[in-house]
């Protein structure tokens, strides 16, 4: 029986199970030959899969690679993560942004150790009971680490499905279509293949249709660009003070409130009024957070303004939960 969102209902080129089987084989063969060599693909350990999926949420692959390796060096197992102090976890996460992900992962690790003997639940349903693990993340972990036959839907999968099927799907319709197309014999690889196709071939702009492994089965040849338009970037200018003493061996930092809506408890440089009077910035840099592009002006000064803060040894900065912007400023100033 055809459901309203079934593949047979809207894909003339894949009406038969034979056509769907061809699509799966072509996509898996392409993935086997052309997939990117990413560190989390070398090991299907559930903890590592979980870590990579959380880090990849709203974060570029290039940025995740460096942090993934360092995080595993500090917390190689779920037990090590559960036993760590939150400040240490946030310090290891510094630079990735969206720190709620780190806090939720830390909380989930404690539950896994306490209630599951240190082993992640082996089903999508069980994984969704943990903090910070939603439908997509649970399906990704379950299919990649445990080969549970469940499909994933993220932005890349949505775009591929809409173009291949020639239909603007949304909500549950996407999940139904993804699960019907899923290769249940190797769901982990198939899910990663669809996401990889969306990331490197079936891109939002200028899709590489000539090199697409399933182009002959695609209903649109890349013409359907998607349903969500990226919001326009807001532009802002902000100013920070870089206070140093003892030959630049110590820097002055302030801590965000523990109940702050963003980056709670993280350490950063004191912000200055904009514009900051007659002070001439020592240097400037660019920084982006979600839909805002910042031009950051940094002023060097010998003594801090009257602000609740703390002098921190430069040698201890790598252990501190710094905001991504603070870390970027220190690198620009050749302090980190």
Positions of predicted regions on the chain:
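Catalytic cores of DNA base-excision repair glycosylases
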Residues: 10, 18-21, 26-210, 214-217, ...
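Intrinsically disordered, low-complexity, charged terminal extensions of DNA damage-control enzymes
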Residues: 1-36, 42, 196-336
């Amino acid at each position: 029986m055809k459901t309203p969102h079934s593949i047979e209902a809207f894909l003339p080129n894949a009406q038969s199970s034979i056509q769907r089987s061809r699509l799966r084989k072509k996509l898996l063969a392409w993935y086997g030959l052309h997939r990117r060599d990413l560190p989390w693909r070398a090991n299907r350990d559930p903890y590592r899969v979980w870590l990579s999926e959380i880090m990849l949420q709203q974060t570029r692959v290039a940025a995740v690679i460096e942090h993934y390796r360092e995080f595993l060096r500090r917390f190689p197992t779920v037990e090590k993560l559960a036993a760590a102090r939150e400040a240490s976890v946030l310090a290891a996460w510094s630079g990735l942004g969206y720190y709620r992900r780190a806090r939720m992962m830390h909380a989930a690790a404690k539950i896994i150790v306490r209630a599951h003997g240190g082993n992640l639940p082996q089903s999508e349903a069980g994984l969704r009971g943990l903090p910070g693990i939603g439908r997509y993340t649970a399906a990704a972990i379950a299919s990649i680490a445990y080969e549970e036959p469940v499909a994933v839907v993220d932005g890349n999968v949505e775009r591929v499905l809409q173009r291949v099927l020639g239909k603007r799907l949304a909500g549950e319709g996407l999940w139904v279509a993804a699960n019907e197309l899923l290769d249940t014999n190797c769901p982990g690889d198939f899910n990663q293949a669809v996401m990889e196709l969306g990331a490197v071939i079936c891109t939002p702009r200028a899709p590489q249709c000539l090199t697409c492994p399933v182009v002959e089965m695609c209903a649109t040849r890349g013409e359907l660009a998607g349903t969500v338009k990226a919001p326009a970037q807001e532009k802002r200018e902000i100013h920070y003070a870089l206070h140093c003493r003892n030959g630049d061996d110590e820097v002055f930092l302030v801590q965000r409130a523990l109940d702050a809506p963003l980056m709670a408890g993280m350490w950063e440089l004191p912000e200055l009024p904009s514009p900051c009077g007659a002070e001439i910035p020592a240097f400037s840099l660019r920084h982006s957070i979600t839909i805002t592009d910042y031009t950051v002006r940094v002023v060097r000064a010998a003594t801090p303004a009257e602000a609740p803060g703390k002098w921190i040894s430069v040698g201890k900065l790598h252990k501190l939960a710094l905001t991504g912007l603070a870390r970027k400023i220190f690198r620009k100033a050749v302090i980190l």
